[in-house]
Amino acid sequence: TITDARKQVVDFSEGYYNADLLIAVKSTDNSIVKFSDLTGKKVGLKQGTAAASFMKSKYKANYIEFPNIDNAYLDLQAGNLDAVVHDSPNVLYYVKTAGNGKVKSTGETDSILPQQYGFAMQKNSSLTPKVNQALQALRADGTYDKIYVKWFAKQPK
C-alpha cells in the first residue's frame, strides 16, 4: 500500500490497484448490501489490520477476529458468521475461487478505507521509471484490464 510514511523510505511505482474494503456474504444473503447493514451482525475480520481497527471504530457489529482471513471465510461458509470484511482484492479473489457459487461480494458502493497499491523499490531506483512505463503500456493495450478480470471477475475501477 502506498502511504506517505512508506514514501519516506522507498520509492513507489504508479499505483497498479485501487483497493478498499469489501464485504463477503453467503450467495443467498440479500440482507447485507452496504456497510451500515452490518449493525448487529457477526462479522469476521483479520486480526491486527487497519481494516479491523477501522471497522471496530466505525460500525457496531459483533466482530470476531481471525489470525488468518481464510479461517474467517470458512466460518462464513459454515454459517458461523454473517459476513467477512477485508481488502477488496482478497475478497474478490476468494469469491472467484474457493467461494465460487457459495459467497458473493457486496459493499462496493461505499468505498470504505480506499488505498492504492504500488510496487516498492529502493529510493532513487533506476527501475522506477521503467516499471511505470511497463504499467502504462499494460493499460494502453488492454492487458491490464484482461488480467484484472481474470483474477477478480470484475472490471477495474
Model-derived regions: residue spans:
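Periplasmic-binding protein-like
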Residues: 18-25, 51-55, 88, 92, 96-151, ...
